[in-house]
Amino acid sequence: MHTPIASKGTSGPSRRVEPGMTSPAIVYTRTGDSSVLEPKDREVTEPAAGEVRVRVVVSGVNPTDWKNRTGSGPGEKLAFDEVVPNQDGAGVIDAVGPEVEGLAVGDRVWVYLAQHQRPTGTAQKFTNLPASRVVALPDGVSFDVGASLGVPAMTAHRALTVSEDGPSRLHPGALEGKSVLVAGGAGAVGHAAIQLARWAGATVVTTVSGPEKGALATAAGAHHVVNYKTGDAAADIRELVPGGIDLVVEVAPAQNAALNAAVGANRASVAVYANNGGDTITLDVRPNMVLNTRYQFVLLYTVGDEALRNAEADVSAAAAAGVLDVGEATGLPLHRFPLSETAAAHDAVENGTVGKVLIDVSSE
């Protein structure tokens, strides 16, 4: 059950729309490359019971968005007649449906999983979505940060809380005395994992492919950065953390399985959230058995309500503390697109643009 949150908006009636009122959106009606994305003026509707309507200010783009759009091949039948893409966003509540508590018109919010098992994501000016996927944006936290919290930060939170010994929640001191290896620290999830792990008190090591990405990981807060292309990454990590790594946040398990076994501490956990580099992992049984290594796969769509609620609360607390800031200065360059160029935004993410891709949907 969604925990009600404090509201600073008005508790009066929702704003009604005139019949036939429309707003700009991007839709697709078949799977395929970014050319299937088309502009459309969609009717603005009242939120149903348990829903709110959000005026989206910024929409965040993640790899899952273009992968959902692509499907397993072009021309697949969709579950809905048309789909508005993008899971994450931030904006202002414009209307509140019946049976919603703790949210009100005028509240600044961040949203996540907006398009999961639903046809309407955040690539549109107004979106109706379950109140359970809407979270108060803390005072002083920008819409850019809010639109960057969902998939990246909540995935990172889950990855950092799957160890056998816990913790299940993150806060200052929660990972005190632990060592965390973040594979690919210049990506959006890696960036959030570095920030959250350091906030929680861990010693944070990250692997990168070059000095530019290394500088970004350092700006995010990594204590140690290892360039895996220029030396012996396992030896370098072992020198930095002689006791071994307690928890790996893993983006490329097929490529890094041997490295993880070489640097893991006893009873290390490897949290796998992506399949960069291949879908099949080959594990050397003996070293992993000796370490009692634990592999835990992470997918936000199926982690369960308790994990989502925990992530909501802890990610919001971290954002309020200034921990999850975005932009070049904090290691995550922003790449902005207008709503009309959503296809280009999807292409940027699909092509591996370093940083966070955001779509400006409406004014603040």
Region spans (language model):
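Short amphipathic alpha-helix with an adjacent loop that forms part of the alpha/beta core around
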Residues: 233-242
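Glycine-rich phosphate-binding loop and adjacent beta-alpha segment
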Residues: 255-324, 361-364
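Mid-domain Rossmann-like dinucleotide-binding core that forms the NAD(H)/NADP(H) cofactor-binding site
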Residues: 147-230
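Glycine-rich beta-strand-centered segment in the early N-terminal region that forms part
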Residues: 43-61, 72-115
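Short glycine/proline-centered loop/turn elements that form peptide/ligand docking sites
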Residues: 98-99, 206-216, 229-233, 254-257, ...
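C-terminal hydrophobic helical "lid"/dimerization subdomain
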Residues: 2, 15-21, 307-364
